[in-house]
Each structure stands twice: as structure tokens, then as C-alpha cells.
């Protein structure tokens, strides 16, 4: 492959396309195109390689329905220095609309990526060398990687397929479908070198874990429980997971508690137990930014200190809606988005923690058919140097990946 280099402003602008309906305060361009549909998925995965040149993506032939077991998607990477050329990499049948197949670069590597797949009656993960094409298959799927790329934590994608459609994989039935809180399912630790896998936290264990004061003791009698949204801390010493439940006393909506734990599942800490915690990101090894609905302020973004009760609101007057948040390198700027407003507009913006100012970046129209399981959230992901952001958007008639230039704002 050619030697990587910095993406110049001239090269960026040369690829700009006419976008509608949308508005932008900074340069935006499509880096994928039809007739196939392209997206990446979640906001907390490494989409850019360490040089910022190669951007991972997924390609699919259809939209507006649930994936079927036989549906396969194509994985590839986009060369930002070669007219956004699509480079095919692999295929998989373990995927969903919100998080794809967990495709991401292995931390620190400029040649190895990892993704989930289905082989026979089990889900697996595959480490692929994008230069040589060599593959190594691990006996379990992955959810979140450690920062050194040596291990991962994962949960049961079979269970997610029916408890939270859009986040699990279709193709293998959940053996515990009728079990409200199984003992043999939960969170597994996966050694990415040896493939060794062990259950470290069971769903049953957490369903038996009460919420200490000041958190209320919510009633989940008769409910079905599951885990979702795992993320390892920047120093690899802790990880977050969400405990969710619905049904029974909880009714038809789901409730959520946020926990942290050590990589072996020990030293559990309840971060938020008020039932309405949502998207989150580690700011550093000790602090977590998350949307939560908690007294007395209600729905806001809050900064939690891990393994303590300290919490404070962040941007309460300007970050007023839930979104997919992350910190740009240096932690001054929070990158965030919104769900569609009443005009179906999704807003991409920065929040300056130094001044408390919200800086609009771009607005993308979300057609009404993009809703529920197959909605197309922006899910902003930043480049290693924090100067570029990618988003998924369907404003041009089908989901594609767009590159946003932050340099006019952050320099």
C-alpha cells in the first residue's frame, strides 16, 4: 500500500458533493455512494486507521427490514487519499443495523481489523490482516476491546436479537429465551491471543444485585433481563455495561442501570440506578459522561466519577437532548448528535467544555421510513487527530457515510 499521509484541505474539498436536504457550517462530503448502501454503526468504535487515511465501512443491498439469517453484508475500507476508493475486505452474516458486525481496527494496528461472523451454530470473531488477507478466527464474538488490543468483553447477541432488536444477530436462537435472568449467560472475557473465553458476570447475578442508596430499588418482578453497551476504560482497568429489563412489573418499556467492573468482573460499582441512563463515553480512566434521567434535574448529560457517588451536570442548558457523545483528543471538545427533531432533522455539534458554548456543525434530514430498528443515527466517529468526523446519514435517499471537516472550528 502507498505510504499514508495527511489529508490536505484541497484533497478534502475536491471530493465535495452537492448535498440536499442538509445544512452545514463546515465542509461535508460523501465518501461512499450508491447504488449500494453503506454505513459503519456505533460511535465508540475505531473506524479510522491510525494514520487517518483508511476508513472502515459496511455495504448492504437493502434497507427497511430486519436482517435475515441468510443476509450477508460486505466489509471494506475507504481510501481518503485515492478518490474515496472502496477496498473490499470480507463478508459476514452476523450483523445488525445499529452496530453492524462490530467491525473496527485493533488498537494500535494499521493492518489488522476485527469483526463478528457466524459459523455453524455459533457466533465468532475474525481478526483480518487487510494487507495480506490472513484471517484468524476466535471462538466467541467481541463487543468492546481493551486499549492494548489483547482482550475483549462480550455479551449474548442471541439474547439481544429478541430483547433489543437492532443490536443482536439473527440466525441462532437464544437457548435461554424463556429464562428471565439466566445463570449461564451474561458478560464474557475473551483473550484475543488464545481465544480463551470465560463468563465473568451472569445476568442472574446482576438481577439479584439491589441498588444501594441513593438509587431507588426499582421493581423488575417478572421482567426479562439482558446486558448491552459494553465499553472498556482508556487504561483498561475497568469497563462499563448496561443492565436492562422489561416486561412484568416494568411493563412494555425497558429500564436501565449502569455498572462498572474490573476486567475479571470483580469490584462491581453501580454508576446510575435511576432507570433512565443511556449513551455514554469514558472521558478518562475515572470519569464517565452519560445521558441520564435522575433527580433533581431530570434528563441531562452528567459526568460521573467511577467508584464514587460524585456526579455533576455537563452543558445542562445547551446539551438538552440525548445523543451519541464522545470527547475529541484533549477532552476540551465533546462531539455529539441528536435524534431527529419534529422536522426530522438530526443535528451534529460540538460542545466546548472550556466556555460552555455549543457549536453547530451540520444538520441532516432523516426520512420518516428510517425509524425503529433500521433507523439511521449519525453516530459520529472522529479521526485519530480529532480533525475529521464521519457520520451515517440517509438524507440523499439511502444510508451512506459522510466525512465532516472540523478544522474551521477547532483549528
Regions found by a protein language model. Name each.
Residues 1-18:
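N-terminal secretory signal peptides and thylakoid transit peptides that target proteins
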Residues 32-37, 90-96, 198-221, 361-372:
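Surface-exposed loop and turn segments in beta-propeller and other repeat-based domains
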Residues 42, 70-113:
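Blade-loop segments of beta-propeller domains
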Residues 46-54, 101-112, 144-151, 231-238, ...:
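Blade-terminus and WD-like Trp-Asp/Gly-His loop motifs, strongest in beta-propeller folds
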Residues 58-71, 157-183, 242-254, 337-343:
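Short, conserved, GDST-rich strand-edge loop motifs in beta-rich repeat architectures
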Residues 100-102, 116-186, 201-215:
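Asp-box/WD-like beta-propeller blade repeats and closely related beta-sheet repeat scaffolds
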Residues 315-324, 357-379:
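Conserved blade-ending motifs and adjacent loop-strand segments that build the rim/top face
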Residues 316-355:
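Loop/turn-rich, solvent-exposed surfaces of beta-rich toroidal or solenoidal domains
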Amino acid at each position: 500500500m502507498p505510504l499514508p499521509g495527511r489529508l490536505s484541505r484541497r484533497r478534502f474539498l475536491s471530493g465535495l458533493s452537492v448535498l440536499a436536504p442538509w445544512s452545514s457550517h463546515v465542509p461535508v462530503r460523501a465518501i461512499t455512494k450508491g447504488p449500494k448502501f453503506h454505513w459503519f454503526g456505533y460511535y465508540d468504535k475505531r473506524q479510522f486507521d491510525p494514520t487517518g487515511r483508511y476508513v472502515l465501512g459496511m455495504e448492504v443491498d437493502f434497507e427497511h427490514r430486519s436482517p435475515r439469517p441468510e443476509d450477508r453484508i460486505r466489509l471494506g475500507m475507504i481510501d481518503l487519499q485515492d478518490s474515496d476508493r472502496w477496498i473490499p475486505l470480507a463478508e459476514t452474516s452476523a450483523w445488525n443495523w445499529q452496530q453492524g458486525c462490530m467491525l473496527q481496527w485493533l488498537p494500535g494496528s494499521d493492518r489488522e481489523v476485527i469483526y463478528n461472523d457466524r459459523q455453524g451454530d455459533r457466533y465468532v470473531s475474525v481478526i483480518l490482516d487487510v494487507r495480506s488477507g490472513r484471517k484468524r478466527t476466535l471462538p466467541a464474538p467481541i463487543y468492546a476491546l481493551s486499549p492494548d488490543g489483547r482482550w475483549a468483553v462480550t455479551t449474548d447477541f442471541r439474547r439481544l436479537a429478541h430483547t433489543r432488536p437492532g443490536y443482536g444477530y439473527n440466525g441462532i436462537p437464544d437457548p435461554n429465551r424463556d429464562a428471565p435472568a439466566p445463570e449461564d449467560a451474561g458478560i464474557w472475557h475473551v483473550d484475543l491471543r488464545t481465544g480463551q473465553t470465560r463468563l465473568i458476570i451472569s445476568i442472574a447475578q446482576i438481577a439479584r444485585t439491589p441498588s444501594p442508596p441513593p438509587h431507588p430499588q426499582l421493581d423488575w418482578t417478572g421482567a426479562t433481563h439482558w446486558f448491552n453497551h459494553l465499553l472498556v476504560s482508556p487504561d483498561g482497568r475497568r469497563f462499563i455495561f448496561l443492565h436492562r429489563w422489561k416486561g412484568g412489573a416494568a411493563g412494555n418499556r425497558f429500564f436501565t442501570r449502569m455498572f462498572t467492573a474490573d476486567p475479571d468482573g470483580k469490584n462491581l460499582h453501580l454508576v446510575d440506578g435511576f432507570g433512565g441512563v443511556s449513551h455514554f463515553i469514558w472521558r478518562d480512566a475515572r470519569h464517565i459522561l452519560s445521558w441520564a434521567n435522575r433527580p433533581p434535574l431530570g434528563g441531562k448529560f452528567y459526568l460521573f466519577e467511577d467508584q464514587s457517588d460524585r456526579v455533576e451536570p455537563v452543558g445542562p442548558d445547551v446539551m438538552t437532548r440525548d445523543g451519541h457523545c464522545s470527547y475529541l483528543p484533549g477532552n476540551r471538545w465533546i462531539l455529539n448528535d441528536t435524534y431527529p427533531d419534529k422536522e426530522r432533522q438530526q443535528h451534529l455539534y460540538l460542545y466546548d467544555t472550556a466556555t460552555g458554548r455549543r457549536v453547530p456543525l451540520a444538520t441532516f434530514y432523516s426520512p420518516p421510513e428510517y425509524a425503529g430498528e433500521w433507523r439511521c443515527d449519525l453516530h459520529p466517529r472522529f479521526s485519530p487527530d480529532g480533525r475529521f468526523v464521519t457520520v451515517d446519514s440517509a438524507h440523499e435517499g439511502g444510508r451512506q457515510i459522510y466525512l465532516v471537516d472540523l478544522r474551521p472550528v477547532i483549528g
